[in-house]
């Protein structure tokens, strides 16, 4: 059983009991997310349960993914180097993206856990 959800500008294939990293988590700041914060994700695009497949247009009604935040963290630093040739103009800076790791507890459709 799995579901495809939309969160943080990405589409993820999620299964109960697994954890995932998301960059832009809804409208929550990564610093405000504490450990074991319960979350509900309503943007469910598709649910597959054994032989049945439910597809939303664009999202499924009455479908919810229940989970909790494990922790928020910063991803690895990327270095950006800009240079104009023959001008002696150089600029080097880095960036670390905020990210949150969450675990999927259950997939619910029409109020029932699948």
Swiss-Prot record:
Pfam families: Ribosomal_L21p (PF00829)
GO BP: any one term: translation
Keyword flag Cytoplasm: no
Gene Ontology CC annotation, any one: chloroplast
Domain of life: Eukaryota
Gene behind the chain: rpl21
Family: Belongs to the bacterial ribosomal protein bL21 family.
Subcellular location: Plastid, Chloroplast
Role summary: This protein binds to 23S rRNA.
Keyword tRNA-binding attributed: no
InterPro entries: bL21-like, bL21-like_sf, Ribosomal_bL21
Species this chain originates from: Physcomitrium patens (Spreading-leaved earth moss)
GO molecular function, one term: rRNA binding
Name under which the protein is recorded: Large ribosomal subunit protein bL21c
Keywords: Chloroplast, Plastid, Ribonucleoprotein, Ribosomal protein, RNA-binding, rRNA-binding
Self-association state and partner proteins as the record states: Part of the 50S ribosomal subunit.
Record-linked NCBIfam families: L21 (TIGR00061)
